[in-house]
């Protein structure tokens, strides 16, 4: 089983990601799961709204 790592993301970066997502998808607020990957496809941020 793969280890799950938790990365702490500061609130400013998280708000910036949210602004960009809302600009492209007005229904973003419906989303519950966001994954951000780098150029190689490695997951760098995962946000789960509860």
From Swiss-Prot:
Positions of the propeptide removed during maturation: 34-50
Enzyme class: oxidoreductase
Top-rank lineage group of the source organism: Archaea
Record carries keyword Oxidoreductase: yes
Annotated binding of Ni(2+), by residue: 27, 30
GO MF terms held by the record: metal ion binding; oxidoreductase activity
Keyword Acetylation listed: no
Cofactor list: Ni(2+)
Its EC number(s): 1.12.99.-
Swiss-Prot/TrEMBL keywords: Metal-binding, Nickel, Oxidoreductase, Selenocysteine
Subunit structure of this chain's protein: The F420-non-reducing hydrogenase vhu is composed of four subunits; VhuA, VhuD, VhuG and VhuU.
Note, other: The large subunit of Vhu is split into VhuA and VhuU. Each contributes two ligands to the [NiFeSe] center.
Similarity remark: Belongs to the [NiFe]/[NiFeSe] hydrogenase large subunit family.
Protein name according to UniProt: F420-non-reducing hydrogenase vhu subunit U
Gene: vhuU
């Amino acid at each position: 089983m793969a280890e799950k790592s938790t990365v702490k993301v500061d609130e400013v970066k998280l708000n910036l990601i949210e602004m960009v997502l809302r600009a492209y998808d007005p229904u973003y607020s419906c989303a519950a799961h966001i994954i951000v990957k780098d150029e190689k496809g490695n997951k760098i941020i995962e946000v789960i709204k509860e």
